[in-house]
C-alpha cells in the first residue's frame, strides 16, 4: 500500500502533524546528530499535553538551514511524561511519544517545506514559535508523495 493510502484510509481517521526536530541553537546538522534523527520517540518541551495520539502520523521538520521535512513516523503511544525531564537542562522534553518510522531520510535529503505549502497556508510562517501543527489532508498528501519520490531516488 502506498504511503498516502496508509495514512489516509477512509476507515482510519487519524491526524497528521508537522513536528519540529532540533532547534536554532542545536540543529540536526549539529555534529551530535550527524544529520539524522532516529530516536524511538519524539519529545515535546511544553508542559501542556500534546494533542498527538497513538496512530497519528508526524512529518518531521528540521527548521535550521535546510528547512527540510525528512521523515514520517507513526505515533505508537499517546504522550507520556518523560521520567528524565529536567527543567534546568536545555532541550529537555516534558512529554515523549513513541514512534515507528515509515520513511526516515538524512536531513539533507528531505524535501523543502515550501514544496508542500499550499494556497491556504504558508507552513513556514504557521510553524514559527510552535513545536507542532496539524496538517491538512492536502499538505500531508503532498508530503507523502514527495517523500516517497525522494526515497525511490
Residue ranges and their predicted role:
Residues 27-29, 52, 68, 77, ...:
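Residues in flexible loops and secondary-structure boundaries
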Residues 66-72:
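Short, Lys/Arg- and Gly-enriched loop/turn segments at beta-strand edges
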Residues 72-73, 79-80, 148, 153:
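Alpha-helix boundary/interfacial micro-motifs
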Residues 74-138:
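Aromatic- and Lys/Arg-enriched surface recognition patch
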Amino acid at each position: 500500500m502506498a504511503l498516502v493510502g496508509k495514512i489516509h484510509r477512509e476507515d482510519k481517521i487519524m491526524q497528521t502533524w508537522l513536528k519540529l526536530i532540533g532547534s536554532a541553537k542545536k540543529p540536526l546538522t549539529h555534529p551530535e546528530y550527524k544529520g539524522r534523527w532516529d530516536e524511538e520517540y519524539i519529545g515535546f518541551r511544553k508542559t501542556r499535553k500534546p494533542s498527538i495520539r497513538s496512530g497519528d502520523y508526524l512529518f518531521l521538520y528540521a527548521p535550521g538551514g535546510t528547512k527540510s521535512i525528512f521523515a514520517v513516523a507513526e505515533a505508537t503511544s499517546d504522550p507520556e511524561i518523560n521520567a528524565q525531564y529536567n527543567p534546568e537542562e536545555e532541550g529537555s522534553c516534558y512529554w515523549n511519544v513513541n514512534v515507528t518510522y515509515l520513511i526516515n531520510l538524512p536531513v539533507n535529503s528531505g524535501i523543502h517545506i515550501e514544496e508542500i505549502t499550499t494556497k491556504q497556508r504558508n507552513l513556514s510562517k504557521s510553524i514559527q514559535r510552535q513545536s507542532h501543527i496539524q496538517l491538512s489532508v492536502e499538505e500531508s498528501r503532498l508530503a507523502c508523495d514527495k517523500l516517497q519520490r525522494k526515497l525511490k531516488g
